[in-house]
């Protein structure tokens, strides 16, 4: 145990001298205190998840001159390797991925990126209207979505439900489902569920109320729509069904007609 602590201290001291590369090409010393705080935030309220262990694993994956945007990726990889030790590490890993996604989306929309605070509700509320407008402008979202009361829907978002994701579920959404432009994801998880809900509620008489009902159901994970609905609801290609059933006679002419 003493040797392990000594190795950890030596490892930490050596990383105090590392430089990280910023987006403008300049470099600055690695802020180990900030990194430790970020990891503490990802571990909050997760039993059997050890902040120090994730920090040690992350430091092993850092190198001098590493781009600052790569540090979150190193953190994700490091936390992911610990899932075998305790299942709760999957939630810590998902939170690290969430932080990356928040930064990616808010940077794209030119919004403040200091999002890992206690004000997730304010961030989502402010972000949501920008997200809808940009999605419409990029011809990714149905212009009819702008006819909804976006203020009301933004306030109905439940940012705390972002914490429900396991790493694999969030990574799957990130890789396959979230809206993106030029390979940049700008759709956050709760906006994703609300976009689907809005697409489903477009023809309803009280469409905002119905959208909120659909959103609350989807974002609770009590019900999940089929893949075509997740892909297409609220977009310019509103195909919602997975398949179509019809009746044909038992001969090739009918089958191919």
Regions flagged by a language model, labelled:
Residues 1-257:
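Extended catalytic cores of very large enzyme megasubunits
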């Amino acid at each position: 145990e003493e040797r392990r602590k000594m190795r950890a201290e030596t490892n930490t001291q050596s990383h105090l001298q590392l430089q990280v590369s910023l987006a403008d090409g300049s470099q600055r010393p690695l802020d180990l205190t900030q990194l430790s705080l970020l990891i503490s935030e990802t571990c909050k309220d997760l039993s059997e998840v050890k902040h120090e262990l994730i920090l040690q694993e992350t430091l092993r994956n850092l190198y001098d001159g590493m781009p600052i945007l790569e540090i979150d990726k190193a953190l994700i990889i490091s936390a992911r390797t610990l899932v075998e030790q305790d299942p709760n590490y999957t939630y810590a890993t998902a939170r690290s991925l969430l932080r990356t996604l928040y930064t990616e989306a808010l940077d794209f929309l030119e919004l403040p990126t200091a999002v890992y605070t206690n004000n997730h509700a304010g961030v989502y509320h402010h972000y949501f209207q920008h997200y809808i407008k940009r999605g419409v402008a990029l011809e990714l979202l149905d212009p009819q979505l702008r006819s909804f009361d976006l203020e009301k829907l933004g306030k109905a978002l439940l940012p705390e439900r972002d914490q429900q994701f396991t790493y694999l579920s969030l990574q799957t959404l990130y890789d396959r489902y979230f809206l993106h432009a030029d390979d940049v994801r700008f759709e956050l998880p709760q906006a994703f569920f609300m976009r689907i809900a809005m697409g489903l509620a477009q023809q309803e008489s009280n469409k905002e109320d119905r959208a909120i009902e659909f959103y609350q159901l989807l974002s609770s994970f009590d019900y999940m729509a089929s893949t075509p609905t997740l892909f297409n609801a609220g977009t310019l290609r509103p195909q919602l069904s997975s398949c179509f059933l019809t009746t044909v006679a038992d001969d090739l002419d009918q089958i191919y007609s």
